UniProtKB/Swiss-Prot annotation:
Gene name in the database record: sodA
Record's protein name: Superoxide dismutase [Mn]
Catalytic activity annotation: 2 superoxide + 2 H(+) = H2O2 + O2
Positions bound to Mn(2+): H28, H76, D160, H164
Gene source species: Mycolicibacterium paratuberculosis (strain ATCC BAA-968 / K-10) (Mycobacterium paratuberculosis)
Subcellular compartments: Secreted
Enzyme category, top tier: oxidoreductase
Cofactor: Mn(2+)
One example GO MF annotation: superoxide dismutase activity
Annotated EC: 1.15.1.1
Amino acid sequence: MAEYTLPDLDWDYAALEPHISGQINEIHHTKHHATYVKGVNDALAKLEEARANEDHAAIFLNEKNLAFHLGGHVNHSIWWKNLSPDGGDKPTGELAAAIDDAFGSFDKFRAQFSAAANGLQGSGWAVLGYDTVGSRLLTFQLYDQQANVPLGIIPLLQVDMWEHAFYLQYKNVKADYVKAFWNVVNWADVQKRYAAATSKAQGLIFG
């Protein structure tokens, strides 16, 4: 069975300073993200064993663990690509037009996305996603690593609101962290994800 691996980053840990510290990025990548990768591989191995033993209770437990850790791995893999030392400013082209159509303007989108991030209770993510059924952009709060996400949604932009993503630098002032995040958003990556999402067929099939 193929195992999941920790991806390399496109930039050095300190490249996002002063907006996100190198210390945070190094710990975030080598400790937290690495833990999710180990967790998903461990869950897969235990799930395979549970299925071989027809242990249904263990199957359900490890499917739950798999969803959590795989969610963490996927979310962080998108997170690193969503960031760039050359980021910031605003999107252009088709993505900019889609944001204007869905939210009224970029400023209104930014305010709504920031409110989703700052208002999240506990741990999770704020997400800009593409609804493949309704062919529209949506923002929503993702709880923990995998909860509250409708099927058929493709994530385009995410901000990590777990405390490990900001507390060493911003303490409990989440709003300052979210404000700093906008300075390093890699809109080229978000645009690429949008183009890929909109090129797909309808996400769910209705009989």
